[in-house]
Design a protein with these regions (language model features):
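Beta-strand-enriched, solvent-exposed domains that form extended recognition/catalytic surfaces
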Residues: 28-63, 67-74
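Structured catalytic cores of large enzymes
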Residues: 64-131, 206
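Structural alpha-beta junctions
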Residues: 63, 155-167, 277-286
């Protein structure tokens, strides 16, 4: 056992020393991030457990001279002229996994909680617009991420309740679309999300690949940031929006229902507060990570209850939904008696 420990320690130390020496020549944010992710994959392929591999990755970035924040499997790294959030979920979830929150090098912060409160009853208020928009930015990933049956079911239920429905997928879900097309009575987003510990904010991925030369005003204000997701062992970076984007582009929403089928959409109320402050009636989301399959089945049941069975938001949530394996719970903020 001692011999194996020495081999393991030597392997990790060797990787770190070699990597830091190579980075010292020409430090670049993207290069440092990719090098770390490459080692993360290598550690996991060698049989190192996910949580331990995350720990090694955090130490790698700290040793590389970056500021590192951690919230479960969401790692925020800042340095060498850039910032990235790494959504290092395990297979089959909408990105985040794990529930601790740690900042390396500074005192840890304590994010706020999420969830609706107050009494619950039948619907007594509704969106003032009979339009709905459905967003599916990661349909291209295939497997469980490709689920046209879900969108057909939700579209049918919404149309039965009198809503006109538009649908956007993959690269159609741009930051420009998010800035201009979400003024609807219902907004449903099915995609990757996470938590940026450096700002204590929920973040939601678009379907648009990252570029330093686009949306520069949004970047400079922190309204969009760079987040990375894993697909088949490769990592891809996307424009990802923060609560600030919603607060700065919307102010008169039509008492909307915002439904986030994304990991950690209600880890705290930061994203919900932005939507509600912009005029939304209620915001539904998951407190932790959620498996794609369970998130899909819950969303399909919720929209059937809201549109066909006449339930309110709080009545849906009170049925009690907890994601297998992750413990994520469906919650809401805002007006629980909002109906569709």
């Amino acid at each position: 056992v001692k011999k194996m420990r020495k081999i393991y320690t030597g392997m990790v130390t060797g990787i770190l020393v070699f990597s830091i020496v190579s980075l010292a020549a020409a430090p670049d944010h993207t290069h440092v991030v990719k090098e770390g992710l490459s080692h993360f994959n290598a550690w996991k392929s060698q049989g190192i457990e996910h949580g331990k591999a995350l720990g090694l990755l955090k130490q790698y970035y700290v040793t590389a001279g970056m500021q590192v924040y951690s919230a479960g499997s969401d790692i925020t790294v800042i340095g060498y002229g850039g910032k990235s959030v790494l959504l290092l979920h395990e297979s089959g979830t909408w990105s985040a996994s794990g529930f601790d929150s740690t900042l390396f090098g500074k005192p840890p912060g304590t994010p706020g909680g999420g969830g609706g409160g107050g009494g619950c009853g039948s619907p007594d208020t509704w969106p003032t617009s009979s339009s709905a928009i459905l967003l599916d930015p990661f349909e291209w990933q295939g497997g469980v991420f490709h689920n046209p049956q879900l969108f057909n079911a939700i579209k049918s239920d919404l149309q039965s309740a009198g809503y006109s429905v538009s649908y956007y997928k993959n690269t159609q879900v741009t930051i420009s679309l998010i800035e201009t097309k979400l003024d609807k009575g219902v907004v449903f987003n099915r995609g990757h999300g996470g938590y940026d510990s450096s700002t204590r904010s929920v973040i939601i991925c678009s379907g648009e690949r990252w570029s330093e030369n686009k949306y520069t005003t949004e970047q400079n204000n922190g309204w969009v940031i760079r987040a990375w997701i894993d697909h088949g062992g490769e990592y891809y970076d996307f424009f990802t929006y923060t609560p600030g984007l919603i607060s700065n582009y919307y102010s008169d929403l039509p008492n909307s229902l915002i439904y986030m089928e994304s990991c950690e959409g209600l880890r705290n109320s930061s994203m919900a507060d932005a939507w509600l402050g912009a005029g939304a009636g209620a915001y539904m989301g998951w407190s932790k990570s959620v498996t794609v399959v369970y998130g899909d089945s819950t969303a399909e049941e919720n929209f059937n209850d809201l549109c066909i069975n006449g339930l309110s938001v709080c009545e849906c949530v009170e049925k009690g939904y907890t994601s297998p394996y992750t413990g994520g719970k469906l919650k809401y903020e805002g007006t629980g008696t909002l109906g569709l």
